Amino acid sequence: MELYQAYTDYHGMMDLTENLYRYIAKEVTGSEILTYGEHTMDLSKPFERITMVDAVKKYANIDFNEVPDTAAAKKLAEEHHIEYEERHEKGDILNLFFEEYVEEHLIQPTFVMDHPIEISPLTKMKPEDPNYVERFEFF
């Protein structure tokens, strides 16, 4: 799903998305608790909001804030047997670590925020760190 709203930021869009999913679940199923396969998802609780860097740190125990540059990121990828292309920069490699180590763990509703600029070059940069952008994905 993709949606836009004027006069808000990405935090406001996350709020809107969270409320929309909660409302739809309640209207369609009569509950904010959903079962999918062997998993139960609880939409009644606040959805987790985590940065991509923090998610990789949580599930891969690697802090990309401590990775100084692209060369170090590529070395780290090699050590973890993560394939990358020569053109990839540090942010691209962060995204590869996210795909390898994090995605499978995101069962409960989660917003992954603050993606690297390399994978979202047209998105508004974070004022406090232009290496990241004000973007989120809902899992």
What is each stretch, according to the model?
Residues 28-40:
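Short, glycine/acidic-rich hinge or "gate" loops at secondary-structure transitions
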Residues 1-25, 41, 46-139:
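A translation/RNA-centric and nucleic-acid-associated enzymatic feature enriched
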